């Protein structure tokens, strides 16, 4: 028996006399449950399915009971320490096929998370084909605590869609269609993404909470393409399987010739005593540890972008100059010209050259960029470098090798072709565009958008469509890495029609992430408040776009949406009434006094995770003795709301309404209960409180 205790995580791994390797336990407390010997064979360290191999038992559409997964035997393990923390590697081998697998568990100092992945090697004499390989597998996720799993287990997911990102919901297993009626079944709870938008319908993460044991297991899949996880049951236990793309679910299939290797998509898996809040805290710390070191996530400069509820992708010199003046006046530090700068009129299906339009900028775009610099701001431009419009003049310089291909045809989506970043000519094209913007135009900020989903993949130089997509995904990440090496101070925002690619393959590289294209500031409140559960608050870019026809409370609500995160200012600032523009400036001035806390703070939710149908929403950030609490009144007749802050129970903290200073709001602190009661004016209103204990 191998017992591992590290950073508050407890792992128990058994190697039997027959050299079968079983992960009996992974949790935030030691293994105390007695697992019956007859059930232990279901506690696989990994699952691996090769083409032509059998499947065992009743398995339905699940990936459990795989072969040669069930045949893999222990071939050794190592336990070392590197700069990140402790590292476990378990080697397994199949004596029949010759396939070898190395299961990696990388711990990170001081955080209750491991990064887990599997490396396959064909050490046999014949080619093999892989249909499924787990990145992490764990059986018995429900074994702790008394009671029936139908009642004690909850799963929290973030549903996603264009303008409706980060819709957090918590379910009992029966609410997702899984009932505990037998000791094993064919049913699974499956979450999957297929395509180049990694968060198109679900974020690649989840939290499983055991109400009886008071512990939670959580995971995030760190990949910018197709991925899969599932919960299934076997040996009267729940099994979690986490992976990248699969043949069954994502059109991925891979041949391995003798001597060839394949590395699975990595996943971060952790466990805590407590619920979602504890998981979010651990993930926040971990996400900061794996992120590319960069000054942007420390400085948190304020961005103005001219798109949302403003120029809507139709910039000109005439329209931009007054906006630049107004943005500088309120304190913005970047000014990003969004879509449309490269073409007159309608431009959607013609993109690809990324040359400025002389009709939009008669004096040249450098005139406008220099004007931005003269106002003390860093200029930025919008790009969409992974696509080329079907009517782009640039197409004359290309051939089919530049693009995703399926069934001999170029893949089209929304009148664009998907570029294939495995092609050196595509890399040269992308490098040339970046070099021109940075070195010739002096751009310091790029909003990198991506408005198509390329689907299941490409057949070019690939064993399957999904194999082609995975290769491209990894090639794009390698290209990003090269750009950040070349231009370490360049800020590149990750945007995919808002938050359609919100994953930590991308966010371990990008310092900032667009959270949504949501155009309604009231609807945005729940998206903003839920975002720090999916990414660090300093990476979470939230639009604030005061409306020309709004009132003071509309401006305040807009600003509160962004003040605990990363401010993406927009709106027709030059046309706002002076006192309403002064509310924008007041908010940004205040933001500059607190932003040094944001990269070191952890999020909390006094009312629980936000509900887009809820009447009140609240988000807090905590750093040491300081807490910042945003509260939004969305709907309903209740004039006040109670915000529990349990760790302050029995204390008498200093509390102030930090923003706005001159508008009505009342509050009361119940010291014995640890509850802040806030009353806000009727309608759609919001306030930001500062609490010092």
Residue ranges and their predicted role:
Residues 302-306, 337, 379-383, 446-448, ...:
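Hydrophobic faces of well-ordered beta-strands that scaffold small-molecule active sites
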Residues 1-233, 657-667:
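Polysaccharide-binding surfaces and accessory modules of carbohydrate-active proteins
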Residues 79, 254-273, 683-692:
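Short Pro-Gly-centered flexible turn/kink motifs
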Residues 118-120, 339, 343, 357, ...:
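Active-site and adjacent substrate-binding regions of carbohydrate-active enzymes
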Residues 107, 130, 236, 343-394, ...:
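Acidic/aromatic-lined carbohydrate-recognition and catalytic surfaces
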Residues 319-341:
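Catalytic domains of carbohydrate-active enzymes, especially glycoside hydrolases
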Residues 299-301, 310-314, 358, 385-436, ...:
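Active-site-adjacent "subsite" loops/lids of carbohydrate-active enzymes
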Residues 26, 476-668, 675-690:
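Active-site-proximal substrate-binding groove within the catalytic cores of carbohydrate-active enzymes
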């Amino acid at each position: 028996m191998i017992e591992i205790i590290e950073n508050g995580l407890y792992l128990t791994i058994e190697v039997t006399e027959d050299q079968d390797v079983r992960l009996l336990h992974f949790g935030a407390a030691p293994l105390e449950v007695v697992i019956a010997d007859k059930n232990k064979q279901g506690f696989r360290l990994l699952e691996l399915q090769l083409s032509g191999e059998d499947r065992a038992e009743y398995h339905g559409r699940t990936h459990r009971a795989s072969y040669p997964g069930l045949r893999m035997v222990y071939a050794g393990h190592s336990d070392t320490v590197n700069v990140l923390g402790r590292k476990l590697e378990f080697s397994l081998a199949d004596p029949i096929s010759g396939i070898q697998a190395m299961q990696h568990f990388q711990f990170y100092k001081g955080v209750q998370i491991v990064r887990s992945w599997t490396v396959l090697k064909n050490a046999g004499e014949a080619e093999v084909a892989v249909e499924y390989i787990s990145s992490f597998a764990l059986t018995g996720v429900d074994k702790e605590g008394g009671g029936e799993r139908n009642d004690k287990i909850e799963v929290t997911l973030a549903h996603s869609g264009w303008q409706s990102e980060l819709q957090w919901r918590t379910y009992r297993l029966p609410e997702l269609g899984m009932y505990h009626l037998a000791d094993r079944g064919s049913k699974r709870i499956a979450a999957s993404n297929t395509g180049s938008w990694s968060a198109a319908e679900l974020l690649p993460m989840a939290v499983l909470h055991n109400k009886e044991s008071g512990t939670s297991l959580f995971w995030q899949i760190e990949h910018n393409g197709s991925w899969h996880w599932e919960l299934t049951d076997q040996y009267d236990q729940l099994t979690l399987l986490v992976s990248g793309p699969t043949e069954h679910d994502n059109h991925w299939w891979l041949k391995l010739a003798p001597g060839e290797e394949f590395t699975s998509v990595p996943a971060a898996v952790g466990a805590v005593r407590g619920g979602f809040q504890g998981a979010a805290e651990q993930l926040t710390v971990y996400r900061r540890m794996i992120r590319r070191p960069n000054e942007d996530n420390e400085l948190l400069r304020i961005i103005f972008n001219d798109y949302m509820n403003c120029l809507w992708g139709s910039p000109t010199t005439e329209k931009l100059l007054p906006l630049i003046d107004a943005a500088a006046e309120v304190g913005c530090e970047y000014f990003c010209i969004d879509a449309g700068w490269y073409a007159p009129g309608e431009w959607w299906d013609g993109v690809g050259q990324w040359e400025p339009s002389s009709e939009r900028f008669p004096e040249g775009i450098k005139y406008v960029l220099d004007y931005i610099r003269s106002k003390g701001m860093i200029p930025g431009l919008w790009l969409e470098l992974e696509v080329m419009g079907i009517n782009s003049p640039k197409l004359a310089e290309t051939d089919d090798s530049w693009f995703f291909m399926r069934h001999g045809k170029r893949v089209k989506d929304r009148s664009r072709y998907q570029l294939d970043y495995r092609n050196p000519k595509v890399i040269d094209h992308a490098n040339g565009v970046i070099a021109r913007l940075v070195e010739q135009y002096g751009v310091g900020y790029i909003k990198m958008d991506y408005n198509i989903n390329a689907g299941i993949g490409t057949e070019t130089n690939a064993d399957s469509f999904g194999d082609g997509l995975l290769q491209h995904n990894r090639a794009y990440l390698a290209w990003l890495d090269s750009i950040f090496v070349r231009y370490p101070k360049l800020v590149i925002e990750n945007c995919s029609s808002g938050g359609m690619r919100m994953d930590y393959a991308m966010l371990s590289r990008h310092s900032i992430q667009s959270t949504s294209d949501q155009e309604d500031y009231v609807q945005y409140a729940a998206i903003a408040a839920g975002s720090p559960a999916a990414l660090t608050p300093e990476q979470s870019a939230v639009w604030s776009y005061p409306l020309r026809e709004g009132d003071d409370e509309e401006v305040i609500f807009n600003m509160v949406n962004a003040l605990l995160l990363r401010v993406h200012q927009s709106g027709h600032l030059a046309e706002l009434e002076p006192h309403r523009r002064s509310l924008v400036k007041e908010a940004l001035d205040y933001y500059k006094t607190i932003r040094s806390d944001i990269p070191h703070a952890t999020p909390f939710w006094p009312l629980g995770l936000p509900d887009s149908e809820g009447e009140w929403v609240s988000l807090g950030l905590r750093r040491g003795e300081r807490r910042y609490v945003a509260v939004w009144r969305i709907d309903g007749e209740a004039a006040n709301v109670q915000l529990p802050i349990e760790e302050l129970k029995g204390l008498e903290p200093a509390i102030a309404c930090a923003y706005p200073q001159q508008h009505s709001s009342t509050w009361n602190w119940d010291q014995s209960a640890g509850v802040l009661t806030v009353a806000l004016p009727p309608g759609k209103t919001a306030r930001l409180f500062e609490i010092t204990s």
